[in-house]
Amino acid sequence: MNNILVTGGCGFIGGHLVDQLKANYPQAKIVVVDDLRTPGNHTIKGVKYYLSSIQDRVLLEELKTKYSFDTIFHLANTPRVRRAIEFPAETIDNNVTSTTAVCDIALEHSSHIYFAQSSSVQYDETVSNPYTLSKLFADEILRLYEIEYGVQVTNMFFYSVYGPREADYGPYSTVVRRFKQRVDMNEPLEIFGIGTKERDFTNVFDVVTNMMLMTEDPRIKNGEMKDVHFGRGKPVSINDIADAFNHNKVYKFDMPGEAQKTHCQEPYGEYLGDVLKYITEWKKLYVQQSDS
């Protein structure tokens, strides 16, 4: 990889990915486009940042004419199922239009697109929320560009990623981030439903390490493998997550539109992170800092 574009490269996974890309490919030209729509402002030296939307027509033309990207990591999106349910039009518009823009660049440069797909699309027999719908639309656009125009596409499926610099989406944050906030505010952990929903929590360092392996995998380069799953393969219930925090909890009415269980059936690479150990260590450090 010599010329790399990362959309959403200031965010949680994107920021860690850019760190790793810079370390692994110090001579590569790395360009990040991020409109900071979602929390995150991580930047590093030696990387070109455009703090704007990939949908901006002027920026899009500059990216097409000024650079020649061989690789595009398309991570920019409006995430979080619960937020999407509240803001459906914004979610669908942003996730679909940004994907079309990325395909336009890839067509111009013959780029390989690595697309951040949602693991939830595998579990909904019917479309139950705007986020999943937007990702399905985006997938169809990518499929069209792949079949009709020869753009190479690899789908990346992420499973409940957690770790340092995890984005703060307020009430829409991931369960690990949200529970950290509740502990910090000394408020009970809010569990929607009865806490039996399971998620395949995966450490961000494991994810980006395996993303680097993915880019060098000949099966992916030659199109033999189209889908890559970044998940530990060991789902954990929300109740178990709450118990690891060892904090007061309260149960609330369930939220519609969410899968009962997400489970990575075909993990790509190795995964060393254990979410329960991560939480236990975080809580221990939090208590020590609070006491001091």
Regions found by a protein language model. Name each.
Residues 7, 93-96, 169, 173, ...:
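Short, solvent-exposed loop/helix junctions and linker helices
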Residues 40, 164-167, 260:
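Short beta-loop-alpha junction of Rossmann-like oxidoreductase domains
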Residues 128, 159-173, 193-205, 219:
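Glycine-rich "substrate-gating" loop/helix at the edge of Rossmann-like oxidoreductase active sites
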Residues 13, 98, 175, 237, ...:
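Conserved alpha-helical elements of sugar-nucleotide-dependent glycosyltransferases
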Residues 137, 141-145, 175, 179, ...:
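Hydrophobic alpha-helix immediately C-terminal to the catalytic Tyr-X-X-X-Lys motif of short-chain
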Residues 1-161, 205, 211, 217, ...:
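N-terminal Rossmann-like NAD(P)+-binding domain of SDR-like oxidoreductases, especially those catalyzing
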Residues 102, 142, 179, 267-268:
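Structural element of the ATP-grasp superfamily
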Residues 184-292:
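C-terminal substrate-binding subdomain of Rossmann-fold SDR/epimerase-dehydratase oxidoreductases
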